[in-house]
From Swiss-Prot:
Highest taxon listed in the record's lineage: Bacteria
Protein family per UniProt: Belongs to the MnmG family.
One annotated GO molecular function: flavin adenine dinucleotide binding
Positions with a binding annotation for FAD: 23-28, 135, 190, 379
Quaternary structure, from the entry: Homodimer. Heterotetramer of two MnmE and two MnmG subunits.
Organism in which the protein naturally occurs: Anoxybacillus flavithermus (strain DSM 21510 / WK1)
Gene this chain is encoded by: mnmG
NCBIfam families per record: mnmG_gidA
Name this polypeptide is given: tRNA uridine 5-carboxymethylaminomethyl modification enzyme MnmG
Subcellular location: Cytoplasm
Positions annotated to bind NAD(+): 282-296
Matches recorded under HAMAP family: MnmG_GidA
Alphabetical UniProt keywords: Cytoplasm, FAD, Flavoprotein, NAD, tRNA processing
GO cellular component terms, A-Z: cytosol
Keyword Glycoprotein: no
Length: 638
């Protein structure tokens, strides 16, 4: 009791800011940079300044859906794309043999250089202050967040607060039968803040994630593995990157064996997942090796990728072997994998359990419904992945700054961005496991492509103040060049000359009978924009990004048009707003489950209400009638 009283008197006023960001992982970095760049004085408080933007799991950025999120972050004015472009050791475009909707960029990171560069960016950002400390409580008055209190008793005040604590909330590391309080990579956890959130009325859930062992590169026999080089073509996530890294490092592919599976099978009783020690729910789309062996028992082998963690370290990440089995079992497993028979274990794999908030407690702005002017982003919201965290962090930072500066907040729709899909899924449907973004979650994925993120979002980034005038002018010029070239190809008639017919035969197409518009010829599956340029050349050289857009927009014109028509229908539903003070108990005819879910989520529109699981079309019809009657009643009263 005396200790508590003494701590009350030890509190001191430490400063006031527009925005405070708690945590400096991938979500925290984007949130802080966005707020500061929008003109909000911003304080970042993090447990360890040496671990800013740390990658505790896979040393990579991007991949299916996730890579598109990184492009969206860049198109809006965020930092992740620029940072990985400066620090990667390898980059590859995935799914190049498939349609543009599922193509995605993936980069292997030099994880240590990535941290250094991101820290440097934060240190040099105007309006941004970095502080090492542990936030233990929020200052909440009348349901409004006014600031934070650190473990040293410092009270920092703000007009908005963003919490981006990752997997640190009551974090516990588990290896075999060993369990101890810890954040990722044996960092100190955040316990009191988690308890404080419960005191404020937040509903928390327990999630789990894991990481594989790291081994010494000098002890790997790479002759028994398959090399996985990066692309020869220069690649970049950021639209502003002009200098490309050409000195790439390869990754390597190997496989588990029947002996690996036997060892795992015989020691499943030692796995915390199956012994009952782990209570948290793990990620469905990133299962542990134990889980894979149990779920896919008939599969003779599983892929293992050996990924260097950086240029100046010998640590190699054994991707595909995520495990929390005891350390001695991990050593036995490694010895059965081709190329790893003599590999030295440098770090054991582990599972980590942590607290997350139930994300239906958030508005689409990522402000919490429980406490006003408090925002959350990243794994605290129940997601997995650096990219998902960064996307949320960017939106939370933008909206915290908007709230602090008295501006209108930003909500991205499902048809505008994968970030919009991600946030809408979280706040509307919630999640009972660590959420991973997939292309299949986006109903408008043909519109949400890797190649057109700038066309979708740069205008928005410019309006909110994250895109410079110079960049915006280049963007406008690109848009105009795309439209001009499309217009040219739609009016240019290609005649069936011998040269044209020969080219068409060479690519396996049917010869022309009459003249044809260049755009119509380009729609043929065997034809590319390069082919068209050979027979209908432009007067001036066409920028490769412009050429790519022209080809995709013309080739997929019909499909894109259908998607846009669906979006217009959705907009009508989105425009049917639901009043914040609506009383769902007063609406007769709603199913009990629908009533409960509507009261919990409190959707902002009919479209959002229709996406809530447990709310059926019949419930939506009843809700629409009720809203119409309310309008009629208001008009009559007036």
């Amino acid at each position: 009791m005396l200790r508590e009283i003494r701590r009350v008197f030890m509190h001191y006023e430490a400063g006031s800011y527009d925005v405070i960001v708690v945590g400096a992982g991938h979500a925290g970095c984007e949130a802080a940079l966005a707020a500061a760049r929008m003109g909000a004085s911003t304080l970042v408080i993090t447990l360890n300044l040496d671990m800013i933007a740390f990658m505790p799991c896979n040393p990579s950025i991007g991949g299916p859906a996730k890579g598109i999120v990184v492009r969206e972050i860049d198109a809006l004015g965020g930092e992740m794309g620029k940072n990985i472009d400066k620090t990667h050791i390898q980059m590859r475009m995935l799914n190049t043999g498939k349609g543009p909707a599922v193509r995605a960029l993936r980069a292997q990171a030099d994880k240590f250089l990535y941290q250094q560069e991101m820290k440097k960016t934060l240190e040099n950002q105007e309006n941004l202050t970095l502080l090492q400390g542990k936030v233990e409580k929020l200052i909440v008055e009348d349901g409004v967040c006014k600031g934070v209190i650190t473990h040293t008793g410092a009270r920092y005040y703000a007009k908005a607060v963003v919490i981006t604590t990752g997997t640190f909330l009551r974090g516990e590391i588990i290896i075999g039968d060993i369990k101890y309080s810890s954040g990722p990579n044996n960092q100190q956890p955040s316990i009191k803040l988690s308890e404080h959130l419960e005191e404020l009325g937040f509903e928390l859930v327990r999630f789990k994630t894991g990481t594989p062992p790291r081994v010494n590169s000098h002890t790997i026999d790479y002759s028994k593995t398959e090399i996985q080089p990066g692309d020869d073509v220069p690649r970049a996530f950021s639209y502003e990157t002009k200098q490309y890294i050409t000195d790439q490092l390869p990754c390597w592919l190997t496989y588990t064996t029947e002996e690996t599976h036997r060892i795992i099978d015989e020691n499943l009783h030692l796995s915390p997942m199956y012994s009952g020690m782990i209570k948290g729910t793990g990620p469905r789309y990133c299962p542990s090796i134990e889980d894979k062996i149990v779920r896919f028992h008939d599969k003779p082998r599983h892929q293992i990728f050996l990924e260097p963690e950086g240029r100046h370290t010998q640590e190699v990440y054994v991707q595909g072997l995520s495990t929390s089995l005891p350390e001695h079992i991990q050593r036995q497993m490694l010895a059965t994998i081709p190329g790893l028979e003599k590999a030295q274990l440098m770090r054991a794999g582990y599972a980590i359990e942590y607290d997350a908030i139930v994300p239906t407690q958030l508005w689409p702005t990522l402000e919490t419904k429980v406490v006003q002017r408090l925002y959350t982003a990243g794994q605290i919201n129940g997601t997995s992945g650096y990219e998902e965290a960064a996307g949320q962090g960017l939106i939370a930072g933008i909206n915290a700054a908007c709230k602090a500066l008295g501006k209108e907040e930003l909500i991205l729709s499902r048809s505008e961005a994968y970030i919009g899909v991600l946030i809408d899924d979280l706040v509307t449907k919630g999640t009972n496991e660590p959420y991973r973004l997939l292309t299949s979650r986006a109903e408008y994925r043909l519109l949400l492509r890797h190649d057109n993120a700038d066309l979708r979002l740069t205008e928005i980034g410019y309006k909110i103040g994250l895109i410079s005038q110079e960049r915006y002018e280049k963007f406008v010029a690109k848009k105009e060049a795309i439209e001009a070239e499309k217009k040219r190809l739609k009016s240019y008639i290609i005649k069936p000359t011998p040269q044209v017919q020969q080219l068409i035969r060479d690519v396996g197409g049917s010869e022309l009978k009459d003249g044809i518009r260049a755009a119509d010829l380009l729609k043929r599956p065997e034809m590319t924009y390069e082919h068209i340029q050979m027979i209908a050349p432009a007067e001036q050289p066409i920028d490769p990004e412009v050429a790519e857009q022209v080809e995709i927009q013309i080739k997929y014109e019909g499909y894109i048009e259908k998607s846009l028509q669906q979006v217009e229908k959705l907009k009508k539903m989105e425009n049917k707003k639901i009043p914040e003070d609506i009383d769902y108990d007063a609406i007769t005819g709603l199913a009990t489950e629908a009533r409960q879910k509507l009261k919990q989520v409190r959707p902002l529109s009919i479209a959002q209400a229709s996406r809530i699981s447990g709310v059926n079309p019949a419930d939506i019809s009843i809700l629409l009638v009720y809203l119409e009657q309310g309008k009629i009643a208001r008009v009559s009263n007036e």
